[in-house]
Amino acid sequence: MNFYRDATWVLEDIEKEAAKERISGSMQTLVLKSCKRYKLKSNPKHIYAVLDSCWKYKPYLEKVMKKAHILEDIPKKKGKPLFSRLTLLLLCHDLLLSKQKRIQMGKHPIKDYVLKFKSPLHSEMVKLKLKLKVRELSELVLSEDISNDLPPVRWIRINPLKCHPNGETEPVLAELRKKFTLKVDKWSELVPGSIYYDEFIPNLFGIHPSDKITAHELYKHGKIIIQDRASCFPAHILNPGPSDIVIDSCSAPGNKTTHTASYIYPEPPKDNNTRIYAFEKDPERAKVLQKMIKIAGCSPNISVNVGDFTKLATPEKYKDVTCFIVDPSCSGSGIFGRKFFDSFNRRKIDDKDDDGGIVPDEQEEFIAKEELQTRLAKLSSFQFQMVKHAMSFPAAKKIVYSTCSIHAEENERVVIDLLLDKSVREWGWKVAPKREVIPSWPRRGKVEEFEEVFRDGVTYDPQQLAEGCIRALPKSDGGIGFFAVCFERD
């Protein structure tokens, strides 16, 4: 009974919030907030799983309960019902819609009461399904639920490293056209079976998120790679050539690394010369990185190094490196579609681990602002150190810094801190102009962030600095939220 009591309290909060004109936060946020407020002992994951399902089916359950007259005969004590309407809703949900189709509690008066109505409840549920012309109620809510959790576009890029013999992409594109027969002019026009040719990134295409691609032979053989469009920005901005040597400082899972390789090797490489050094601190993530590199067909040309980039890579050891991609751990606030359970399993920021962690953006509603700012400050300090370390390499001429964060603390303000740093100025680094950073992309950096620091416009032009940065909004711009800036040396 303890679980249903706890879940009822949380459901009461959700119902109150839903009655407002504007709901503050998601279901995940509301569940976590209530669990914290009441100091509940029940597992928040379990509460969320039940309430998420119960809330979706609530209108149907209420109709069934009304028809079965279960709310009319509730026993009373001193004129008040003994059983809560919402607790009964939860029990009816588990009896009718849970996987086990049973109430998860021992002997209790409320359980006995609900089981008295078992037959009429089942009967009314069958009638409702017949009336709605469905076999299961899930048919009515599944499509909406899935669409809310999917990206607006599934982006795929052709991998020239697997396009034999000369990196020709046309045969792969011809195969894609067989599956996706309708070409659309805008990604927002995508429907199942259609394809969009991206205007910003070469060999990148958008398909409808419901279209299955992972079973396709092109995907299995590494000829196409699923990668969000914004995630393709760093390699495209860096645009390294055959003579460049690149370090990807935080490489896993490897999409940016292999995308970078496609610029150095526009066709399958004919030698085993290492041109990219990929660093990953976490050994398990490094295994994923190695697997992705192998699938992409560039294992001989990428050296995977397991360890902290700032400690393992020294300017003396890598004195010939010319280009860097620095995409360090960030708040992840630009990522959408992450399930509630991820918030319990993500890496936390540990005082002993400068690799940072991930802070789910949806938790901002109930994590104290002071705590969030502390986390962002720690992340931005780590990000600053990562980029500054890359800037210290003697042959470095170009660095792309990126995050999947929407917070200025991790984006424009890191750029500002670097520009104000004495060593960075002495090394001759500056923000690359707009013409070198996907100039046709419409959404640029926040000029107001630069105006706060460079008001005089003499040291740096705030407008030019903002235009040298790229931002992408979650979903609105066709994918994840993202930030990218390119530094180049005078």
From Swiss-Prot:
E.C. designation(s): 2.1.1.311
Phenotype caused by lack of the gene: Altered structural conformation of the ribosome in close proximity to cytosine 2278 (m5C2278) in 25S rRNA, leading to impaired translational fidelity, and promote recruitment of a distinct subset of oxidative stress-responsive mRNAs into polysomes.
Alphabetically ordered keywords of this record: Methyltransferase, Nucleus, RNA-binding, rRNA processing, S-adenosyl-L-methionine, Transferase
InterPro entries referenced in this protein's UniProt entry, alphabetically: MeTrfase_RsmB-F_NOP2_cat, MeTrfase_RsmB-F_NOP2_dom, NSUN5_RCM1_N, RCMT, SAM-dependent_MTases_sf
Record-level GO cellular component terms: nucleolus; nucleus
Assembly with partners or alone: Interacts with TRM112.
List of residues binding S-adenosyl-L-methionine: 250-256, 280, 308, 327
UniProt lineage: Eukaryota, Fungi, Dikarya, Ascomycota, Saccharomycotina
Record-given protein name: 25S rRNA (cytosine(2278)-C(5))-methyltransferase
Broad enzyme group: transferase
PANTHER family: 28S RRNA (CYTOSINE-C(5))-METHYLTRANSFERASE (PTHR22807:SF4), NOP2 YEAST -RELATED NOL1/NOP2/FMU SUN DOMAIN-CONTAINING (PTHR22807)
Active-site positions on this chain: 404
Remarks, miscellaneous: Present with 922 molecules/cell in log phase SD medium.
Primary gene name: RCM1
Domain of life assignment: Eukaryota
GO terms of biological process kind: rRNA base methylation
Organism from which the protein derives: Saccharomyces cerevisiae (strain ATCC 204508 / S288c)
Protein family per UniProt: Belongs to the class I-like SAM-binding methyltransferase superfamily. RsmB/NOP family.
Localisation per UniProt entry: Nucleus, Nucleolus
Function: S-adenosyl-L-methionine-dependent methyltransferase that specifically methylates the C(5) position of cytosine 2278 (m5C2278) in 25S rRNA. Loss of m5C2278 in 25S rRNA results in anisomycin hypersensitivity.
Reaction(s) this enzyme catalyzes, per UniProt: cytidine(2278) in 25S rRNA + S-adenosyl-L-methionine = 5-methylcytidine(2278) in 25S rRNA + S-adenosyl-L-homocysteine + H(+)
GO MF annotation: an example: rRNA (cytosine-C5-)-methyltransferase activity
